[in-house]
Structures are given as C-alpha cells and as structure tokens.
Amino acid sequence: MKPHSVFADSLWPSIDLLYDYAPFLQQSMVDGHIGFFPTGITPPRVAIIGAGISGLIAATELLRAGVRDITLFEARDRLGGRAWSQLFDPHYYPRLIAEMGAMRFPPSATGLFHYLNRFSIQTSASFPDPGIVDTELHYRGVRHLWPAGEQPPALFTRVHNGWRALLYEGCLLDGVSLVGPLQITAMLKSERFDEAAEAWQIWLNVFRDCSFYSAMVTIFTGTNPPGGIAWERRDDFELFGALGIGSGGFLPVYQAGFTEILRMVINGYEDDQRLIIGGISTLAEQLARQEIRGTTPGRHVRFSKVNRISKDNGKISLATDVKPVDAFDRVIVTSNNRAMQMVHGLSADETFLNQDVCRAVRETHLTGSSKLFMLTRDKFWLKNKLPLTIQSDGLVRGVYVLDYESDNPEGRGVVLLSYTWEDDAHKLLAITDKKQRGQHLVDELSAIHPEFARYLVPAGADYERYVLHHDWLTDPCSAGAFKLNYPGEDVYSQRLFFQFKTANHPEQDSGLLLAGCGCSFTGGWVEGAVQTAVNSACAVIRSTGGTLYGNPLDSVHSIYDY
C-alpha cells in the first residue's frame, strides 16, 4: 500500500449541511485564524471538556484566534478520546498499532483531511475492505472466494446488483421517485445544491421512520425493485446483511435508521477508505504539541474528570476531581452523549439546553462495539497467499489483516481478529479475559478457516502484551462506541448539531456549547468531531465579542424536515 498525503481532488459538502469546512479552514491558514478579537475586547476564559480530536481542534482554533485562558479537561490518562491508536509495544514496535476507535478515513471527510495535511500525516492507499482486497465470505458453512476488484461470488449476485442499482438509479415507490444516492453525490460535487437538497428531502419524507431492514424490504420486495429482480425473504436479506454496503456485514445494525446508513453513502464515507500510517492518535499528538502564539494546546490540558456543570453569577462552574469549583465564561463539552447526561447532568433541566436538545442528549442511540487485535510473529498471509479479510455469519464476523509496515514484509503482522457491533459485540462481554476471548475466537475461526486460524498465536505466545481488546459499551468514559440513530431520530442529530447557533442569539446563549461526533450527523466518523469543533470555536468567538468571516455560524443552515 503506497503512502500518500491526500486531499480530495473534488471537494464537496455533506448532504445534511451543504457546507464544506475545508475552504473555510484553508482560508484561515491564509488569515492566520478563523476569527479574532478587536482591540478593547478581552477574550473569554474557556473550558473544553474532553481532549479528543474535537476538543483539541477547538482549542487549536481558539488559541489561533487569540484566546489565551483555555483549560482542556481530560478524564482519561491519555489524549485522543475514542481516536485511540494503542501501541502493542512502544519500545520494540513503535509503528504497530491497534486502532481501537476510528480506523477508516475517507478523503471525502474534507475537514479531517485538512488537518491531516496541515500536519503532513500520511494515509495508505486503502483499508482492506471486502472486495477491495482478496476476500473470503463464509455463509451457512460454505466458503466463497472474492478476488480483489472483481464482482462478489455468484450467490450474492442478486443482492449486490440490486444494491448497486439502487445507489445509481434510485427507485420508484408508490408513485414517488427517489433519486439514486450516488446521483445526489454527483449533484453535491457539481454544486447543484438545491437539487441535492430536494432529492434528499424526498428520501427523508419516505423513510425517516424506517429501519435499515424495513426500508430494504419495502424497496426490494415491491413491484419495481432496483436491479429488476425482487429479493426473496428471508434469504436475500440475510445474504445482504453478510455482504454489507462496502465495509463489511451490516446485519447487526439492521435496526438502525435507514437514512443514517444512506447519508454515509451519499457523503462518500463508504468509498476509498484509507488507513492512517501512524494511526489516528498521531493527529491528536500533533494537535497537542503544535506551537501557537508561544504555547501549545497540550500545555492547557488538565488530566481531571469534570463532574457536574452548573451556573453561578453568570459564570459556568465545573466540579472536578481535584478542585471543587472552577468558573469559566464559556464551556465546550465534547464528552460522549451519555457522559453529558449521566456525569455532567446537562439534560436534567434547562439551565444550559432547551427541552428539545435535552431529549436529544438523553435519547440518542449509541452502538456497542468491541475489537480484539493480535500481533503475530510474521505476516503469514503474504507467505501463504491467504485472504486479507474474512467475513462470516458466525461469531467471528470480520477479520482484517493490517499492514502498517508495507516496506517490511518480514516484520510482525497485525490482525484485527474481531470487530463487532451491537448484539455481536454484546455477546463477547461475557468473556472478559482477553486471552480466553482471543482463544475462543480463534477456535471459532478454525471451524471455517483452519489454514488462517493456525497462525493466530501472538508473537512469543505473549497474550498479555500482544493481544489488545476493548469493549466500548463498558468504557466508563463512553458507555458506547458511536452514535447511530434509530428510526425517527435524525431530528436528534439536527438539534444537537445546530445547538451552536445559540451564539447568534444572546437571549438563547447559555455559554455552553456541544461538540463531538455524537453531536453531528456523522456519528462514528472523525469528520463529525472536526465540524462540531470548528462550530463551537466560532460560537465562542462570536458570542464574546470576536469577529468572524465566512464561517459556519453564518453559512450552515438547518433546511430539512427530519
């Protein structure tokens, strides 16, 4: 996989926002800031809760704008939050990582790639998604080979062709014409935003209250199914659940909202997915140590948990583990949605958020997700011509081999042995010991692919050091992996994302702002963290007397009926 520093050749905005953050951020590099404070205006004292990607970007842009009194509070003992590239052994293998959080990075995430380029962080040519690399699909006990770049195995032809037809051609339901999602992408790329918005609103009108599964049944068992052949219940829908939409099987998230899945396709997040050579944590590290006006964001980090947030005499007070009360003019909360509710108490009353936003904080669905990685003695798949990814309908849903040192074919291997969502992840919570879990997964894999499984022993048989796993549902700082709306919940994303607009209305401005991917339309993607970080920084500047030009506060509008 050839490394390169990539920026999308053709930038386009995401469908729900119709605003591309990259040009604004690029212009800020020319200007030296996203905004500033005129002479005579004292910049505010700001707290940022969470030193993940969102918190660090918000701090970066506020420091560049001239805000000096900033404190980032981080409950973990590390930076990055859920953007976590865990090292197997920093001394012996400093380049070999386990991406415990985000691990796929599409260039259509233009805000993210702006910051990757700013720090010259490289990506590799592709993530080993099914069909992109040599793949094996195991379904009902039968092995199906899928060579890289070719059509899926014959068993999957009907569901594959039907899904592709839907993406390119759309469908006709009860006299309503729905434009193909990839046609909407083309509209965004060619700046036909009014057409794109109209087309997306029709999808929202028809499917806002439908699950992924129920929508697929409606579309593909009707009288005019995309691809021309109706799907058979239940076999074809199980097949499609195993095949997925590009990045592996989606059966565990069939109950998610259909529009939540569709927007990922329209936004291009399922295409050209990249690996970051040093892991996404390199972005957090670079953000933290960059020099800005004689300081760095990292010097403003306080490793302390923020508990309740309250208001006192016009200031916002934070109760922390090490100091009873700290008062600030503005607070940006990038914590996970469940921490916002259960730790900070933001949804208990209307001190900071109105009832609609409080409900969105409380009710937004977060997925459970688990990962288990193994560092192997060598890159056995190269020597033995084994598949680079295995997808199955068993306990071991998705296996991926990850090559972070493509220039060293004789080096150690990294295998993502188990990446699961929702019920599939919940099952694994019963096996808390990572050695037992790893061995159990290898045993399961042995039943379908013994040639592959025989090599799954950690280097030196050291399970303690060379097997890494994490369950996001039981993570005390997260209580879930990422936002994935249920049917009817897109309105929650709308309320959370546009909360920053209160900065334009002093009578609504409580001084507290929400950020993080869980407060975006793209939960689980780093782009949502970037967008909301920039939003919150702009809101702080505007609401405290600063000056902004060409910014999302004035340019991003809520135009859809969710």
Swiss-Prot record:
The cofactor named in the record is: FMN
Binding positions for substrate per the UniProt entry: R104
Reactions catalysed, semicolon-separated, are:
L-tryptophan + O2 = indole-3-acetamide + CO2 + H2O
Pathway(s) per entry: Plant hormone metabolism; auxin biosynthesis
**Which sites bind FMN?**
S54, E74, R76, R82, R104
| Cofactor detail note | Binds 1 FMN per subunit.
Provide this UniProt record's keywords sorted from A to Z.
Answer: Auxin biosynthesis, Flavoprotein, FMN, Monooxygenase, Oxidoreductase
Name the InterPro entries for this protein.
Amino_oxidase, FAD/NAD-bd_sf, Flavin_monoamine_oxidase
Family membership noted in the UniProt record: Belongs to the tryptophan 2-monooxygenase family.
Recorded protein name is Tryptophan 2-monooxygenase
Its source organism is Pantoea agglomerans pv. gypsophilae
